[in-house]
């Protein structure tokens, strides 16, 4: 069975896609959101990041050639966005999670002024 034929993988990818759409739909509204809306938006980002981290781990553990290609494309995309080509993606995910924690702290401290 191909990696992408798995019901679990397909469901994860569908959920990632839905979360991405929700995040992108509201990203430009973020500056005008109130405190609770901002916290909800950051929560969506956290869920998206967790799902992406899990999918990346699954891709990394798979022997499926298509999964390996997708993993390589993710690394290529990260490099095109300015990350060094030898970046450890798990470190990238961890750093992104820390950034989201900082955002939540800022929202709590400053209300809606983030």
Regions found by a protein language model. Give the residues of each.
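Generic structural concept
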Residues: 10-13, 17, 42-49, 75-78, ...
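Short terminal alpha-helical segments
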Residues: 1-39
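Amphipathic alpha-helical binding modules
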Residues: 72-114
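A broad "ordered helical/assembly scaffold" signature
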Residues: 2-7, 11, 39-40, 46-47, ...
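Amphipathic alpha-helical interaction modules
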Residues: 25-70
């Amino acid at each position: 069975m191909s990696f992408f034929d798995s019901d679990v993988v397909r469901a994860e990818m569908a959920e990632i896609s839905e979360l991405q759409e929700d995040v992108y739909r509201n990203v430009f509204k973020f500056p005008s959101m109130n405190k609770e809306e901002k916290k909800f938006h950051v929560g969506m980002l956290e869920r998206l990041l967790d799902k992406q981290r899990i999918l990346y781990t699954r891709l990394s553990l798979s022997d499926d050639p298509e999964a390996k290609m997708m993993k390589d494309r993710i690394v290529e995309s990260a490099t095109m966005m300015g990350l060094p080509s030898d970046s450890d993606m798990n470190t990238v995910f961890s750093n992104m999670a820390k950034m989201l924690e900082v955002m939540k702290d800022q929202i709590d401290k400053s209300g809606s002024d983030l």
